[in-house]
């Protein structure tokens, strides 16, 4: 899988403006991502999701995140995440490696 340190840099550049990862972290424009792996879409307590996110019904894991992060609006039409996606597979792998570690600490 990807490189955790490279993934952290990608998170800081592309995700941290809207998301936190630490346990008990606050929601920003996007939800706190702690405990993301193994959780269904639209389930972070206290965050106001669109129906599209709540109704997608998939469980977040490496494969689902690879697809989602490539093109969020294609994967979940109606999501309010304003992010074009990460086209480079290696960058997505690095980000997912970081998320897997950081959202589980």
Curated annotation (Swiss-Prot):
The modification N6-succinyllysine is found at residues 56, 73. The keyword NADP does not apply. Pfam families: Cytochrom_C (PF00034). One of its GO terms (molecular function) is metal ion binding. The modification N6-acetyllysine is found at residues 73, 100. SUPFAM superfamilies: Cytochrome c. PROSITE patterns: CYTC. Its main location: mitochondrion. Gene3D superfamilies: Cytochrome c-like domain (1.10.760.10). One of its GO terms (cellular component) is mitochondrial intermembrane space. Heme c binds at residues 15, 18-19, 81. Belongs to the cytochrome c family. Electron carrier protein. The oxidized form of the cytochrome c heme group can accept an electron from the heme group of the cytochrome c1 subunit of cytochrome reductase. Cytochrome c then transfers this electron to the cytochrome oxidase complex, the final protein carrier in the mitochondrial electron-transport chain. This is Cytochrome c. It comes from Bos taurus (Bovine). The gene is CYCS.
